[in-house]
Design a protein with these regions (language model features):
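Short tyrosine-centred short linear motifs in exposed loops/low-complexity segments
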Residues: 65-69, 110-124, 129-133, 223, ...
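Aromatic-rich carbohydrate-binding modules that target alpha-glucans
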Residues: 25-66, 78-101, 144-187, 196-221, ...
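Extracellular recognition modules
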Residues: 74-76, 126, 192-194
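Sec/Tat signal peptide C-region and signal peptidase I cleavage site
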Residues: 19-24
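Bacterial N-terminal signal peptides that target proteins for export
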Residues: 1-12
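OB-fold nucleic-acid-binding modules
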Residues: 139-143
Length: 273
């Protein structure tokens, strides 16, 4: 009797562990003809973690038009097809704004149907892999299409060199989702900007304009930014006007007071005097 109970408990534990394992993910990204990168995994839209097995993104989603958008989107856990995926299950699902829809992973359901939206717009998308739900709500920001929630600097000028396992993140501005910033030490060398931290060198990069170092282009010739002096820099990218600003940290700092201290003067080492 004890052995039977023990076996049953072990089976329950193993089943629970397998279910949790199938839902767990270190990364989640949106792929499909409803997003800018289409069906290219290296250009899928990276979602950011927002708790254990919860991911969020603000992203421009396009409605089905029968021409450029025929299917919608689904979710990948890596920038490749051979990975755990999440989709709509047995039939395509048109998401109701603010209403959670069920997620199905490709290990339990192989029908691979897609999610769709009624209107092209920026959406705040939340995927809860614990509850296996996806929710899309129209974003307050609609001025420009939002295609990324973070960017990453890569190159021998960065601390991580050309290693995609050690990218330098650029954080999205809380007030303007088209602006990304980083304060980081840069070495003498070159760099460019990735939009997918799992996409490797097959993805489309943000690159230096061939005629203007302060301008950014998306894709094209592999022109990089050159850092000529090692220092800590503030780097700001604005995708609304496709510009980049690279300046030394504290370059704008203005000193308006100096104080003399020491035993060579009357007040000695006293800060108050």
């Amino acid at each position: 009797m004890v052995q039977k109970i023990t076996r049953s408990l072990m089976c329950c534990v193993l089943f629970a562990m397998s279910v949790v394992a199938s839902f767990a993910a270190d990364k989640l990204m949106i792929v499909g003809d409803a997003v800018w990168g289409g069906w290219t995994p290296a250009n899928s839209v990276v979602m950011l973690p927002d708790g254990e097995n919860v991911f969020k993104a603000t992203v421009y989603l396009k409605k089905i038009d029968g021409e450029t958008v025929k299917e919608g989107f689904k979710l990948l856990t890596a920038a490749k097809w051979d990975c755990l995926q999440y989709h709509a299950g047995d039939s395509d699902v048109e998401l109701e704004e603010g209403v959670a829809a069920q997620l199905y992973d490709n290990q339990e359901n192989g029908n691979d149907k897609k999610f769709q939206v009624k209107e092209s717009a920026n959406y705040d998308v939340v995927c809860d892999l614990n509850a296996k739900t996806i929710t899309a709500t129209k974003s307050a920001y609609q001025e420009h299409p939002v295609n990324h929630n973070a960017l990453w600097m890569v190159g021998d000028a960065t601390p991580g060199d050309w290693n995609f396992g050690s990218l330098t993140p650029m954080t999205q501005d809380s007030e303007n989702p088209m602006v990304f910033k980083a304060t980081t030490y840069l070495k003498v060398g070159e760099m460019k900007i990735a939009q997918n931290n799992d996409g490797g060198f097959d993805q489309t990069f943000y690159l230096r304009d061939a005629t203007d170092d302060t301008k950014v282009v998306f894709g094209g010739d592999d022109n990089k930014w050159t850092i000529t002096e090692a220092a800590t820099y503030d780097v700001t990218v604005n995708l609304a006007d496709m510009t980049i600003d690279i300046k030394k940290h504290y370059a704008d700092f203005v000193v308006d007071h100096l104080f003399v201290i020491g035993d060579a003067i009357w007040s000695g080492w006293g800060f108050a005097n």
